[in-house]
A protein has these predicted regions:
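Low-complexity, Gly/Ser/Thr/Pro-rich intrinsically disordered linker/tail segments
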Residues: 309-392
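...with weaker cross-activation on analogous glycine-rich loops/strands in unrelated enzymes
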Residues: 227-309
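Glycine-rich catalytic cores of cysteine/serine-nucleophile enzymes that process amide/ester linkages
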Residues: 140-165, 198-203, 275-339
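Short nucleic-acid-contacting surface segments enriched for D/E, G, S/T with interspersed K/R
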Residues: 73-93
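Structural detector for short beta-strands of small beta-barrel domains
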Residues: 26-50
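OB-fold/S1-family single-stranded nucleic acid-binding modules
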Residues: 97-113
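N-terminal capping segments
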Residues: 114-225, 354-392
Length: 392
């Protein structure tokens, strides 16, 4: 049982008595958010999210409140502005009116992480080199969360993926975990929704804690193209991600794809974005033996064989002796040693990473005229040269 959920279960025993006595129905409080009441229960799901109760701890008391759902759009969907600020175990100043939270603001920690990534980009610099440097910034400190980077209601970009820079929330969550972290269940044959980070209920309770594959790509694009926080985001479904970039006029999309093998003449260029069914990844280029170095967020197994993982440099190849794996291993071990102590480099199966069905998956290649410029000539370089330039 994760510690967040344990605290909720223990403290929730006092909620019924507090509600029955009519205590704390209106007022202002400094309170720690504990989570949605009855998290993981069958009825605590997206269909009922407008009626959730939310648990807060204030001065050792656990209080349960309704919450304002915000305003509705033309289709009748709320925007949930308060829910999209809530993060478990964080301190807030909340305003309560007749048992409903109507306003809140986070009270910043005095000892927030001062993590500085080995490589990072410059917001708004629309070059291929900057895209790849930006994509490296969350590597090694951002765990895989299914729905991470999507908003609470699972409709678009979260606050974190519409904000410049690596989110301190990702770093904090990473630092609170170890190699036994699992994005879903320690034993997938025995699902445990009440104690899982996986969004069984169809909404994203842990949207803020890490990134899934499309959340990661959305953050990378936002931090490449935007220069201020809070603009429209780029997060969207992984299978059609590459195709949507082509629709923006930023480059070429194709389904004429096969796995490189070093002899068939097919290569993935640095910066190419590949969508397969349920996953999306960024190419760092194709090695001489046909293996490919990539960047992505994936729940790869830890050294204790738990499905955790996250944003990392990986390799697509046939074995751990392939050129791409050796490169990925070199850079992950040297520049991200804490991550490397938890997670070996992930070797991806070429058949899985180049096979797809349907009309939406495919490969996207940037146009240097209408998408990203490439003054460094990265599209024509080998992965070894690309990585050396990025980490220079």
């Amino acid at each position: 049982m994760n510690t967040m959920k344990l605290s909720v279960l223990l403290s929730a025993l006092s909620v019924i008595a507090l509600l029955a006595s009519g205590c704390a129905r209106s007022g202002e409080y400094d309170a720690v958010y504990l989570g949605v009441k009855n998290y993981g229960a069958d009825k605590t799901n997206a269909d009922n999210k407008d009626k959730f109760n939310y648990l807060f701890d204030t001065d050792g008391r656990t209080l349960a409140f309704k919450m304002s759902n915000g305003t509705k759009d033309e289709e009748g969907n709320y925007d949930y502005p308060l829910q999209n600020q809530l993060k478990e175990e964080y301190l807030y100043h909340i305003t309560v009116e007749n048992g409903t939270v109507t306003a809140l603001r986070e009270i910043a920690e005095a000892s927030a992480s001062n993590y500085s990534p080995p490589v990072s980009g410059i917001p708004g610099e629309t070059t291929l080199k900057n895209l790849l440097k930006t994509a490296l910034a969350p590597v090694g400190t951002t765990l895989y969360i299914y729905g991470g980077g999507w908003d609470w209601q699972d409709a678009g970009s979260a606050v974190q993926t519409r904000t410049l820079g690596v989110s301190p929330d990702w770093v904090k969550f990473y630092e609170a975990q170890d190699e036994n972290y699992t994005y879903k269940d320690a034993d997938e044959a025995k699902p445990d929704p009440a104690n899982s980070y996986y969004p069984y209920g169809g909404y994203n309770e842990y949207y803020y804690a890490g990134l899934d594959c499309s959340g990661y790509l959305g953050w990378v694009l936002y931090n490449t193209f935007e220069t201020e926080n809070g603009n429209d985001g780029y997060v969207g479904g992984s299978t059609g991600f590459a195709k949507r970039l082509s629709a923006k006029g930023w480059g070429e999309w194709t389904q004429d794809i096969k796995a490189p093998d070093g002899a068939n003449g097919y290569t993935m260029k640095p910066g190419d974005i590949m969508s397969i069914n349920g996953h999306v990844w960024i190419s760092l280029g194709t090695c001489e033996d046909g293996s490919v170095v990539i960047l992505h967020s994936t729940p790869s197994p830890s050294r204790s064989d738990q499905p955790g993982g996250g944003v990392q440099i990986s390799a697509i190849g046939l074995d751990r002796d392939c050129d791409a794996y050796l490169l990925a291993d070199r850079y992950m071990s040297e520049y991200y040693p804490d991550w490397y102590a938890r997670y070996p480099v992930h070797l991806c199966d070429p058949e899985k990473y180049f096979t797809f069905e349907g009309e939406n998956a495919g490969r996207f290649t940037w146009s240097t005229d209408t998408g990203l410029t490439d003054p460094d000539g990265l599209q024509d370089r080998m992965p070894e040269d690309v990585l050396a330039l990025l980490f220079r």
